[in-house]
Design a protein with these regions (language model features):
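Exported/periplasmic ABC-transporter solute-binding proteins
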Residues: 1-161
Length: 161
C-alpha cells in the first residue's frame, strides 16, 4: 500500500575474538585486511554474513591466501561458541545484534568493532502494508508501533540502529 513502507532499522556486521584475547586493529580497510591475514582462523556462518565475508576477502585480494583458514558454521551461535572456546587467534564474524545478544548471555566473546564503513555490509529492515492483506489496519498499527521511539530504543539496545 502506497505510503506505508518505512525503515525499522539497520543491522551492521562486526568482528569478535575470544574474551581476553588481543583485539586486532580493524579501524580501516587496510588494517582489517591485515587482521584477516594475521588471524589463525576466520569463523563465519553459511548464511548472508558468511557469504559476504568470503566475497569481501576475495575483493580485498586475500581470498586465496585465507581460504584454508575460513571456517563456515551453520549459524551465528555456533560461530560465537567456536570463537569463545578457541585457544587460537580466531576471528568471528556476525551481525552486531546477534553478537550483542550472545555476549549479554555470558558467552566469552569480545566485540572488536563493526567493520569499517568502506567495507561494511548493512542489512535494512523495513515494514510495509501489502495490498493483498486482509488486515491492513492491523498491519498499519504494527508498522506505526515498530517505527515509534520506544521500539527504536529496543532495537538500538540490540545493535540495530
Amino acid at each position: 500500500v502506497a505510503g506505508t513502507r518505512g525503515l525499522m532499522g539497520r543491522s551492521r556486521m562486526g568482528i569478535v575474538v575470544r574474551k581476553g584475547a588481543p583485539l586486532p586493529d580493524i579501524s580501516s580497510t587496510e588494517a582489517f585486511r591485515q587482521a584477516m591475514l594475521d588471524a589463525e582462523a576466520i569463523v563465519c556462518n553459511v548464511a548472508s554474513s558468511g557469504v559476504y565475508m568470503v566475497k569481501l576477502l576475495e575483493k580485498l585480494g586475500i581470498g586465496e591466501t585465507t581460504k584454508d583458514k575460513v571456517l563456515k558454521l551453520p549459524d551465528t551461535v555456533k560461530v560465537m561458541e567456536h570463537v569463545a572456546g578457541s585457544p587460537a587467534h580466531a576471528i568471528g564474524v556476525g551481525q552486531l545484534a546477534e553478537i550483542s545478544e550472545l555476549a549479554d548471555k555470558g558467552l566469552a566473546i569480545a566485540l572488536v568493532a563493526p567493520l569499517p564503513d568502506a567495507i561494511q555490509n548493512v542489512t535494512a529492515y523495513n515494514a510495509a502494508v501489502i495490498t493483498a492483506s486482509r488486515e491492513q489496519e492491523a498491519a498499519r498499527a504494527l508498522a506505526r508501533f515498530l517505527a515509534a521511539p520506544e521500539a527504536k530504543a529496543v532495537f538500538a539496545a540490540t545493535g540495530i540502529d
